[in-house]
Regions:
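Structural/interface elements that position substrates and couple domains in central-metabolism enzymes
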Residues: 28, 175, 189-196
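NAD(P)+-binding Rossmann beta1-loop-alpha1 motif at the extreme N-terminus of oxidoreductases
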Residues: 1-50, 54, 106
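Acidic/polar active-site rim loop that often engages polyanionic ligands
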Residues: 23-25, 80, 143-152, 224-225
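Rossmann-like NAD(P)-binding element
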Residues: 56-112, 120
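Rossmann-fold dinucleotide-binding core
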Residues: 112-181, 189
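NAD(P)-dependent Rossmann-like dehydrogenase/reductase catalytic/cofactor-binding core
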Residues: 2, 23-25, 164, 171-182, ...
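Amphipathic alpha-helical segments at domain termini/boundaries
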Residues: 22-24, 29, 65-84, 168-174, ...
Length: 284
C-alpha cells in the first residue's frame, strides 16, 4: 500500500489527506473545485506549521508531509495508479453512487475502496462497484488530525484481506480502530445524532441557551465538546442529512428537530458558512 487517493476536499477530506500523508503514504486530494483544493492546501500547511511551532514535529517532518501531498481536479487520471481510494463526499447516496461507479471504471483491479460515511451501508455502496469484496466503510472523526478513532465497518461482501489492510492503513496514520457490524449509524453516529438532535429540541423548547446547554453537556457528562459546538464544526447540513437517513432506517426517535431544519434552510450551516448555532463572523 503506497498510493492513497482522497475524494472530496471538504473538512473531512482534507483531514484524511493530511493523516494519510502523515502515515507515510503518497496522497492525492481530489475535488471538482480548484478553489476548494487551494483552501485545503492552505489549511494543511497551517496544521503542519502549528505542529512545528508546538514542538510536535520537526520542520523536516512537516516538509515531508507536504511533499507527499498533491492536489488534482482530474479524478479519472489520478485513480489509475491508486492502491486505496477514500471517498469523503457529502452524505448523499446518489453522490456516492456516482463517485464509486466512476472510480470502479478507472482504478486498477487491486485497488481498495473506502467510504468515510458515518451512517450509510457499505454493502449498498459496494453494490455500486464490480469489486464489493474490496469495499469497506472507514469512518474518521472531526477534526481528523486530532481525533484518534477510525470506525471500520465491513459490508456483507467485504473480504478479510480488505478489512485487515484498512486496519493497517489506519494504524499507520496513528489511529486507534474499532471494527463494528454493519447497521445504520454504526456505533458512534447513532449516539451522536441523538444527542445533537435532542439539543436542538431543547433549544427549540427554551430549556436553555446554546452556551448553557453546551456547558452542561461538557461539564456534566464529560464531553470534550458541546453538541452545538460539534454540530457547527461538522456542519449542520451534514448533521441533518445523517438524521434524515437514520430516521428513514431506524424510525421516529431520529426525526430531525424542526429548528435544525430551519437553520439549514437559512444557510446557517456552522463554521463553514460563518454562522450556525453560533456566529463566527463576529470573531473575524
Amino acid at each position: 500500500m503506497e498510493r492513497v487517493i482522497v475524494i472530496g476536499s471538504g473538512v473531512m477530506g482534507r483531514g484524511i489527506a493530511y493523516s494519510s500523508a502523515l502515515g507515510g503514504f503518497s496522497t492525492t486530494l481530489v475535488d471538482v473545485k480548484e478553489e476548494q483544493l487551494i483552501g485545503a492546501k492552505k489549511e494543511i500547511q497551517q496544521i503542519t506549521d502549528k505542529g512545528v511551532e508546538r514542538g510536535k514535529m520537526s520542520e523536516t517532518d512537516a516538509d515531508s508531509i507536504n511533499e507527499r501531498l498533491t492536489y488534482s481536479v482530474h479524478l479519472e487520471d489520478v485513480v489509475k495508479e491508486a492502491d486505496l481510494i477514500i471517498e469523503a463526499v457529502p452524505e448523499n447516496i446518489d453522490i456516492k453512487r456516482s463517485v464509486f461507479e466512476r472510480i470502479d471504471q478507472h482504478a486498477p483491479s487491486h485497488c481498495l475502496f473506502a467510504s468515510n460515511t458515518s451512517t450509510m451501508s457499505p454493502t449498498e455502496i459496494g453494490s455500486f462497484t464490480k469489486r464489493p469484496e474490496k469495499v469497506i466503510a472507514m469512518h474518521f472523526f472531526n477534526p481528523v488530525h486530532k481525533m484518534k478513532l477510525v470506525e471500520i465497518v465491513r459490508g456483507l461482501e467485504t473480504s478479510d484481506e480488505t478489512a485487515a489492510a484498512i486496519r493497517s492503513v489506519a494504524e499507520k496514520m496513528g489511529k486507534e480502530t474499532v471494527v463494528v457490524n454493519e447497521f445504520p449509524g454504526f456505533v458512534t453516529s447513532r449516539i451522536s445524532a441523538l444527542v445533537g438532535n435532542e439539543a436542538f429540541y431543547m433549544l427549540q423548547e427554551g430549556v436553555g441557551t446554546p452556551e448553557e446547554i453546551d456547558k452542561a453537556i461538557k461539564l456534566g457528562l464529560n464531553y470534550p465538546m458541546g453538541p452545538f459546538e460539534l454540530g457547527d464544526l461538522v456542519g449542520l447540513d451534514t448533521r441533518l442529512n445523517n438524521l434524515k437517513y437514520l430516521h428513514e432506517k431506524l424510525g421516529e426517535k431520529y426525526r430531525p428537530a424542526p429548528l435544525l431544519e430551519k437553520y439549514v434552510k437559512a444557510g446557517r450551516l456552522g463554521r463553514k458558512s460563518g454562522k450556525g448555532v453560533y456566529d463566527y463572523q463576529k470573531n473575524d
